[in-house]
Amino acid sequence: MADLEEQLSDEEKVRIAAKFIIHAPPGEFNEVFNDVRLLLNNDNLLREGAAHAFAQYNLDQFTPVKIEGYEEQVLITEHGDLGNGKFLDPKNRVSFKFDHLRKEATDPRPCEGENAIESWRHSVETAMRAYVKEHYPNGVCTVYGKTIDGQQTIIACIESHQFQAKNFWNGRWRSEWKFTITPSTTQVVGILKIQVHYYEDGNVQLVSHKDIQESLTVSNEVQTAKEFIKIVEAAENEYQTAISENYQTMSDTTFKALRRQLPVTRTKIDWNKILSYKIGKEMQNA
């Protein structure tokens, strides 16, 4: 092990550490960071060399953050990234600095979004917040209005998590939905992601995602937002139901097939007669 450590350059050590951090399960960033910190044994190297991994983790995980002075949380996503460690809260029209290691928001300042698309963004946000409140009690959503390649685009991100470290499991739901505002009809593109880690007496992870594409009729802002939410609700319900049914099927068939029905002897043990068995006598003599 010492020989291997001597062969690794600082760059290689940081690259390995960064991979561990980026793949940390939901709610376990601090634990993975502390373990990597002990292994690397060089805080300056870790902070400087793996800073991109801290940022990538928060962007990938849709990390929610509370801005002081504002009631609702906002998600850290690539769509709100303003550069230089600053992010956008489109609902409250503020920018803020985000510390990717401490996961803290500071220095909120007024920041105007794209006014030309604000009425569309606001309508979708209102409908989306009502949907999230109904289906994800602990959920957070952030809705952006942006011009991408000359097209006015709405992007809605949802995050909901449950961290149960005392019960040895953590899980997170993420979904991202987008559509461009075009006459008559447009395409809604979505990606749904589930990640769960269970680690009591073992180490099991569920990592699943599904891509969605549906047609959306475009009319006025409010009606289009309602139709958009119908698509989101149907797709997310179907996906979650399918995940549950697959797990039930695996429990009834796959996992059951892995269990040995009988001992190697092909006979069941009569525990009332255990002393008459050779193993029973050996236990008695012991």
UniProtKB/Swiss-Prot annotation:
Modification type N-acetylalanine: residues: A2
Q: Which SUPFAM superfamilies match?
A: Subunits of heterodimeric actin filament capping protein Capz
UniProt keyword list: Acetylation, Actin capping, Actin-binding, Phosphoprotein
A GO-annotated cellular component: F-actin capping protein complex
Gene Ontology annotations of biological process type:
actin cytoskeleton organization; barbed-end actin filament capping
Q: Which InterPro entries match?
A: CapZ_alpha (IPR002189), CapZ_alpha/beta (IPR037282), CapZ_alpha/beta_2 (IPR042276), CapZ_alpha_1 (IPR042489), F-actin_cap_asu_CS (IPR017865)
User: What's the domain of life for this entry?
Assistant: Eukaryota
Q: Which residues carry this modification: Phosphoserine?
A: S9
Note the Pfam families from the entry. Answer: F-actin_cap_A
On whether Acetylation is a keyword of this UniProt record, the answer is yes
Q: Does the keyword Secreted apply?
A: no
How the protein assembles, per its UniProt entry? Component of the F-actin capping complex, composed of a heterodimer of an alpha and a beta subunit. Component of the WASH complex, composed of F-actin-capping protein subunit alpha (CAPZA1, CAPZA2 or CAPZA3), F-actin-capping protein subunit beta (CAPZB), WASHC1, WASHC2, WASHC3, WASHC4 and WASHC5. Interacts with RCSD1/CAPZIP. Directly interacts with CRACD; this interaction decreases binding to actin.
Family assignment? Belongs to the F-actin-capping protein alpha subunit family.
In UniProt terms, what function does this protein have? Answer: F-actin-capping proteins bind in a Ca(2+)-independent manner to the fast growing ends of actin filaments (barbed end) thereby blocking the exchange of subunits at these ends. Unlike other capping proteins (such as gelsolin and severin), these proteins do not sever actin filaments.
Name this polypeptide is given: F-actin-capping protein subunit alpha-2
Lineage, broadest ranks: Eukaryota, Metazoa, Chordata, Craniata, Vertebrata
Give the gene name.
CAPZA2
